[in-house]
Amino acid sequence: MLSSILLAAQATVPNTGTTWNWNGTPIIIASCLLVLLIAGRSIRYPHVGTKMPLPFPSIFNNPSVATFLAAMSFGHIIGVAAVLGLTNLGVI
């Protein structure tokens, strides 16, 4: 009973969304790496806890897992904001 109601509702909803593409991916990757470079040097205690096994620890200041997760989270926020802004400006 419930599945037939859901199928009926799905058939009436128009598909207005665009398909996903790779245009903003390099911007998000670059923003994450930039924030990781900055965060390893600006966080008060970047080495407290388990170390993140990164390929070039000296470049990234050998951050802990918590520093890495915080940097990636903030990098994604900055990157998505940049992609949305550039998309609204028509650059991407």
Swiss-Prot record:
Major localization class: membrane
Topology class, membrane: Multi-pass membrane protein
Keywords, sorted A to Z: Membrane, Photosynthesis, Photosystem I, Thylakoid, Transmembrane, Transmembrane helix
This protein's record includes keyword Membrane: yes
UniProt GO cellular component terms: photosystem I; plasma membrane-derived thylakoid membrane
Chain segments annotated as transmembrane: 21-43, 65-87
Pfam families the UniProt entry points to: PSI_PSAK (PF01241)
Highest taxon of source: Bacteria
SUPFAM superfamilies assigned to the protein according to its UniProt record, in alphabetical order: Photosystem I reaction center subunit X, PsaK
UniProt subcellular location: Cellular thylakoid membrane
GO BP field: photosynthesis
UniProt key word Transport: no
InterPro entries (UniProt xref): PSI_centre_PsaK_sf (IPR035982), PSI_PsaG/PsaK (IPR000549), PSI_PsaK (IPR017492), PSI_PsaK_bact (IPR037101)
Family: Belongs to the PsaG/PsaK family.
Full protein name: Photosystem I reaction center subunit PsaK 2
Protein species of origin: Nostoc sp. (strain PCC 7120 / SAG 25.82 / UTEX 2576)
